[in-house]
């Protein structure tokens, strides 16, 4: 009892203290839970975005600017076209197939007429007729070169560098232009952006080795692409009835490849007639047959009359293509040799494999006209190497409808879903185009204020130092070969060379531009001489 009473007093005092503390403590209020929103009611409309510029909403796909927004395939197309431009500007200017052409225009500029004979070779005897096939392309090349010279200014080497740089820019522009037209032709023929882009990649792979050389042929390639664009419709349009004859008249005065266009049109016409004759027996009632026949007739008339030589122009063109000296001495005029070494024969074999794989797996039949095109141009590519250039554009064009059929059969695996047009993709395409320009050689001219050095812009085989030393022996900086300077000083008055230069056709092209006719250069244009001359 003595121990129990004090213990109870202590325990009661503790309970009394804790109870007072609990009574004096103020508890926080419980949080109030807001009711959940009613999902059954429509959401409140968002405020309209602030308009930018002249009242345009760049984030609205239904705005008036939406039709001008680009999609993913447009970005890829810009990349491929920009790649073609950049690549064309980065290639060396070749030492052949360019300088001699510009020299003829220089002569025409000085004499105000087209030459009726070889003006630079004293050995031309007239037995082989002189024909000016390249007037328009030569004029274009020469005046672009002159514009580059004037833009660069400075001494003669600096002006030469400016002229070469402008020619490289022209090469890039024509490459990009041809790629753009081919995309349009493939898109019109197959109505599929992915397949059209695939067709351009095929052209690029088949024609890659030819892209490196700037020559009048690039004009003909652009005309061929325009022809493919015109004939990619189900029926040739009325505008093409006027435009194609005009184009053939210009093409005939630009490059001898205009015959390729005529062959293509005739094969399409013959194939269409045969196809309808077997089906209906009345091919001439078909609009496509009528318009193709009219285009062929008008184009033959235009090209055969609007040239310096009249209808004999066709015979002159065929004679050039069968010149024995060209067929035996120039590599690209020879037939393909099938060997293990690298060459264009591999391009032909690879394309034949692709053709066989495509036509055997496609559900579409091959029209007779396309069969004729593949057979005739395939044989032509085997007999003459330079035909591979046209084969590279025609094969993808013929196969486009079959690739579209295969893509539709395996669409989940081959075709991406269509992209949504957007301003961001449009801006990305602009960035890609700007990047292509910044990688090109003219961007260096814009940034540095001067073109690429002449020796860096022309091929190593260009004998420009030799020509400059022969033309300016008195200048110390022109003395490229000390041995030649010693010989000129010892054996020639005023150190000026007199006589003729025996050069290969490749080397003679630039020497003719720089030295002829003051110093005659032999063996430059071998097609101007009778075979027994050699």
Model-predicted regions and their roles:
Residues 233-249, 291-295, 368-375:
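Short hydrophobic alpha-helices at membrane interfaces in multi-pass membrane enzymes
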Residues 482, 486-531:
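Short periplasmic/luminal acceptor-recognition loop of GT-C membrane glycosyltransferases, typified by
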Residues 211-219:
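Short acidic/glycine- and proline-prone juxtamembrane loop motifs at membrane-interface regions
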Residues 225-241, 355-362:
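Membrane-interface transmembrane helices that cradle and orient dolichyl/undecaprenyl
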Residues 414-493, 508:
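Membrane-proximal, lumen/periplasm-facing interface regions of secretory-pathway glyco-
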């Amino acid at each position: 009892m003595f121990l129990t009473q004090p213990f109870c007093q202590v325990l009661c005092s503790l309970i009394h203290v804790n109870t007072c503390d609990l009574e004096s403590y103020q508890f926080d209020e419980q949080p109030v839970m807001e009711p959940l929103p009613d999902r059954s009611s429509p959401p409140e409309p968002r405020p309209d975005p602030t308009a930018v510029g002249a009242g345009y909403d760049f984030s609205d796909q239904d705005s008036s600017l939406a039709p001008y927004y680009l999609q993913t395939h447009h970005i890829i197309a810009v990349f491929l076209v920009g790649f073609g431009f950049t690549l064309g500007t980065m290639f060396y200017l070749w030492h052949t197939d360019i300088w001699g052409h510009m020299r003829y225009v220089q002569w025409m500029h000085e004499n105000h007429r087209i030459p009726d004979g070889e003006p630079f070779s004293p050995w031309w005897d007239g037995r082989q007729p002189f024909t000016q096939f390249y007037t328009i392309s030569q004029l274009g090349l020469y005046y672009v070169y002159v514009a580059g010279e004037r833009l660069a200014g400075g001494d003669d080497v600096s002006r030469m560098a400016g002229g070469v740089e402008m020619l490289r820019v022209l090469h890039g522009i024509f490459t990009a232009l041809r790629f753009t037209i081919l995309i349009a032709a493939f898109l019109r023929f197959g109505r599929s952006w992915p397949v059209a882009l695939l067709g351009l990649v095929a052209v690029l792979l088949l024609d890659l080795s030819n892209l490196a050389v700037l020559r009048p042929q690039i004009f003909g390639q652009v005309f061929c692409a325009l022809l493919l664009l015109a004939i990619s419709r189900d029926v040739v349009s009325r505008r093409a009835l006027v435009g194609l004859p005009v184009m053939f008249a210009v093409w005939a005065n630009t490059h001898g490849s205009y015959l390729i266009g005529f062959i293509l049109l005739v094969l399409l016409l013959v194939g269409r007639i045969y196809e309808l004759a077997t089906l209906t027996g009345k091919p001439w009632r078909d609009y496509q047959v009528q318009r193709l026949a009219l285009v062929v007739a008008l184009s033959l008339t235009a090209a055969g009359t609007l040239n310096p030589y009249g209808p004999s122009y066709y015979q002159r063109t065929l004679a050039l293509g069968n010149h024995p000296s060209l067929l035996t001495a120039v590599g690209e005029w020879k037939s393909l040799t099938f060997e293990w070494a690298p060459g264009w024969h591999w391009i032909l074999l690879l394309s034949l494999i692709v053709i066989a794989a495509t036509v055997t797996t496609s559900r579409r039949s091959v029209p007779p006209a396309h069969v004729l095109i593949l057979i005739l141009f395939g044989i032509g590519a085997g007999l003459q190497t330079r035909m591979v250039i046209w084969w590279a554009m025609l094969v993808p064009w013929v196969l486009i409808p079959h690739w579209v059929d295969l893509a539709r059969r395996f669409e989940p695996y081959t075709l991406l879903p269509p992209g949504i047009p957007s301003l961001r993709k449009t801006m990305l395409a602009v960035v890609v185009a700007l990047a292509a320009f910044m990688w090109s050689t003219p961007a260096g001219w814009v940034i540095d204020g001067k073109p690429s050095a002449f020796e860096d812009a022309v091929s190593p085989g260009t004998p420009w130092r030799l020509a400059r030393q022969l033309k300016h022996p008195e200048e110390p900086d022109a003395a490229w070969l000390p041995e030649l300077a010693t010989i000129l000083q010892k054996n020639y008055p005023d150190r000026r060379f007199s006589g003729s230069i025996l050069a290969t056709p490749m080397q003679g092209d630039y020497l003719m531009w720089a030295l002829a006719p003051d110093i005659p250069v032999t063996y430059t244009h071998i097609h101007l001489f009778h075979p027994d001359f050699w």
